[in-house]
């Protein structure tokens, strides 16, 4: 298992967002140990989401003998990619750079992104993307697909976005809304959203409620 901890992220930490094979501890460990490197510096913090990017398979991996996961920035609303946030050190960052082919032509490169953890916090993190000049698709192998799918399940994250990327099925959307206060069912302003929404039930969310002002 990954070294998974529950703690506040230190401001000086290097954070990394993984969304593909690096979600899998065994796969990461095998890659490192084959090269005589220490895999222990990839410390999983927990599940996370990257907003505004769509999972795709437009990169062919010779080592995987099929398509490899990539991220494509999109202007579409309600698009995000699930994955995990990790804390890493400089040594592990160098390992990730080597694994992803940074500084090698037509391989993955670092990108700074904003990801959101399950508590709603935002974090600046490094991830790796490949800039493809063509709209192409490479079928991933079943084993590679399973690496991602099994770890999304482990992280209790949905696999809808993975299914879309593989099968070109309809793009999942965030079409649920949590409301509180006067927009709730039976309250004074609920009629403003009633015609456009179907009530599914009551729920709770972790957070703090503030009195801002009258408006």
Question: Across the structure, where does each feature detected by a protein language model lie?
Answer:
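A glycine-rich, hydrophobic/aromatic-adjacent loop/helix-cap motif
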Residues: 2-215
């Amino acid at each position: 298992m990954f070294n998974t901890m529950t703690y506040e992220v230190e401001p000086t930490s290097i954070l990394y967002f993984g969304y593909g094979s690096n979600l899998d501890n065994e796969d990461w460990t095998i890659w490192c140990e084959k090269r005589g490197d220490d895999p222990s510096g990839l410390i999983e913090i927990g599940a996370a989401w990257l907003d505004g990017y769509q999972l795709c398979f437009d990169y062919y991996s010779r080592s995987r003998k099929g398509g490899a996961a990539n991220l494509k920035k999109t202007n579409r609303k309600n698009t995000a990619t699930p994955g995990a946030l990790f804390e890493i050190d400089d040594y592990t960052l160098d390992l990730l750079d080597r694994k992803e082919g940074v500084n090698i032509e037509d391989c993955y490169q670092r990108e700074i992104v904003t990801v959101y953890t399950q508590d709603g916090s935002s974090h600046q993190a490094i991830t790796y993307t490949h800039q493809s000049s063509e709209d192409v698709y490479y079928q991933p192998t079943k084993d590679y697909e399973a690496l991602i799918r099994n770890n999304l399940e482990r992280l209790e994250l949905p696999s809808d976005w993975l299914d879309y990327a593989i099968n070109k099925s309809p793009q999942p959307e965030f079409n649920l809304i949590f409301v509180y206060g006067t927009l709730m069912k039976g309250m004074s302003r609920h009629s403003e959203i009633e015609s456009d929404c179907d009530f599914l039930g009551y729920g709770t969310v972790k957070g703090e409620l503030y009195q801002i002002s009258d408006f």
